[in-house]
Structures are given as structure tokens and as C-alpha cells.
Amino acid sequence: MAETTEPPSDAGTSQADAMALAAEAEAAEAEALAAAARARARAARLKREALAMAPAEDENVPEEYADWEDAEDYDDYDDYEAADQEAARSASWRRRLRVRLPRLSTIAMAAAVVIICGFTGLSGYIVWQHHEATERQQRAAAFAAGAKQGVINMTSLDFNKAKEDVARVIDSSTGEFRDDFQQRAADFTKVVEQSKVVTEGTVNATAVESMNEHSAVVLVAATSRVTNSAGAKDEPRAWRLKVTVTEEGGQYKMSKVEFVP
């Protein structure tokens, strides 16, 4: 036969019940003491009345008063009233305890709920912040990569395939820069072919200066080695550029190029 397992009682409730039972026991004890005190006080009063009515020399005290010797300590009602007040205080404390314990339990539960909600909100905020930071880093990296590739295309030319190299520069640009470069593409191609220019560009560093949803300004440090018919042979050239990169159809292209002194 399967045993039925009762769910464990709540620790907070068990403690509250124990405290309430202890309070009830103390109150009951106080009430018993008060009742005994009242009985002794009443016995003392009756004894005094009986003795007052009998002659001073009469030693025949009624038998019902023989057991009242222990009431000698109660000369008046002071002890009776003190005991009664003590019992009243115990009962009052017990009532306050019964009210206070559930109230404290409710406050503790409410505090726990508030703390849990606070931690949940904080965790959500941290996750959101992490997501935002990760997305921003990814976008910055994409803009920097677009600037890097555009500058490499601009500084890497070979007169043997000048048209293809110029077309690659146009393909990696957009907006104002693309329009200007495309207008001068034919003349630029002729200069490269006639001068027998061969350049190989390298981007050394990039840094995103500013960024919004669709574009970014990227600082680029680059070098190139130039060989031409004028006598240059792998001559190094240094370039410092400020490149505006714009997202266009999921691609990151140069839309403006400025030379920085």
C-alpha cells in the first residue's frame, strides 16, 4: 500500500505556530496564577471577617478556615489586583502576537517578491545592455571593414589592368564619392596606363570616430608602395584618411573620402 507523503510545512509558518503556542501557554499559566491569587485573597478576607466576629480569647476557629493559613500573605486586594493585571497583560500580549506574526510573515513574503522582481528586472536590463553593446560592436566592425577595403582598392592599382582596378573602386563606393570618381574614371585610367603605375596599398589601422544607424566616419591609416615610369621603385607613401562609410543594401561602401594632414 503506497504511503501518502504530506508536503513539508512552511518553516516560517511552523515557527509562527510554535511562538503562538508558547504565548498561549504563558498566558494560561498567568491566568492560573491570577485565579489562585484571587482565591487566597478571598480566603484571607473571609478569615479576617470570621476572626472579627469571634471573641478574642475564643480559640475555636471553624474548620473551614483551617486551611487558609497560607493566605496570610494577602492582607488586602493589592496582590489580587496585581495578579489580575498580570493575567490581562499576558492575554493582551498573546492577542498582539497572533496579529503580529501573520503580519510579519506577509511583509517577509512581500519583500521576497520585491527582491525577486528586482533581480529579474536587473537581469533583463543586463542582457539587453549586453545585446546592445554586442550589436554596436558588430556594426562598428562592419563599417571599419568597409572603409579598409575601399582604401585598399583606391591604393592598389596596376596599369596592366587599370580599367578593372578603377571599376573595383567604383563598385566599393557610393553617393558623392562614387559620382565624382565615376566622372573622372576615364581620365584617371589613362594617367595610370601612361605612367605605368603599380601601387600596392596596405591599411595599418582603422578607428570608428562616429556612427549612426546607416553610416559611420572611420579614420584610416594606410601605406602604399609606388612604382612608375618616372623612376619610382616601391617608394613608400603614407596616407591618413577620414572615410565616411554608408550601408547600402547590406554592403558597406565609401561615400566620402577626405585626406587628413
UniProtKB/Swiss-Prot annotation:
The chain crosses the membrane at residues 107-127. It is found in: Membrane. The keyword Transmembrane applies. It is a single-pass membrane protein. Keywords: Membrane, Transmembrane, Transmembrane helix. Residues 1-22 are annotated as: Disordered. GO terms for cellular component: membrane. The keyword Transcription regulation does not apply. To M.tuberculosis Rv1362c. This is Uncharacterized protein MT1408. The lineage of its organism: Bacteria, Bacillati, Actinomycetota, Actinomycetes, Mycobacteriales.
